[in-house]
């Protein structure tokens, strides 16, 4: 008689690599609708620069690259390239509209320091 055992690793759920909030997805959907191009996707990336060493960037893209991680939320596709992915694991991508203005906000547990503008960080 053969027995099959399952390890905890095979039965546990994989952690969500990042959180794309409803508010962020809804705002992106609104912006895509305004552009009139349903093929647009939101690309979030990290690049060198800013006062803390790295900075976040957002752009619309029609293409999904081979190394992209794709997240679907509320009819919107979020793209993160493989280099940026390592800096964004565990992060939350949100959209805030309050007295300080309207903007996309990234809460990143990997950032050891951030600057006052909120778009630059170091690890």
Swiss-Prot record:
Record-annotated disulphide pairs: none
An annotated GO BP: iron-sulfur cluster assembly
PROSITE patterns given in the database record: HESB
Record-given protein name: Putative iron-sulfur cluster insertion protein ErpA
Pfam families reported in the protein's UniProt record: Fe-S_biosyn (PF01521)
Protein family membership: Belongs to the HesB/IscA family.
Cofactor requirements of the protein: iron-sulfur cluster
UniProt GO MF annotations: 2 iron, 2 sulfur cluster binding; 4 iron, 4 sulfur cluster binding; iron ion binding
Known role: Required for insertion of 4Fe-4S clusters.
Residues that coordinate or bind iron-sulfur cluster: 51, 115, 117
């Amino acid at each position: 008689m053969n027995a099959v055992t399952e390890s905890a690793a095979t039965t546990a759920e994989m952690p969500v690599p990042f959180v794309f909030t409803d508010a962020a997805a809804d705002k992106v959907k609104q912006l895509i609708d305004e552009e009139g191009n349903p093929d647009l996707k939101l690309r979030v990336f990290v690049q060198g620069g800013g006062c803390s060493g790295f900075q976040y960037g957002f752009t619309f893209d029609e293409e999904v690259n081979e190394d992209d991680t794709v997240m679907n939320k509320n009819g919107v596709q979020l793209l993160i390239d493989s280099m940026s992915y390592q800096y964004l694991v565990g992060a939350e991508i949100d959209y805030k509209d309050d007295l300080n203005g309207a903007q996309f906000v990234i809460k990143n547990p990997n950032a050891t320091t951030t600057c006052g503008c909120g778009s630059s960080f170091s690890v």
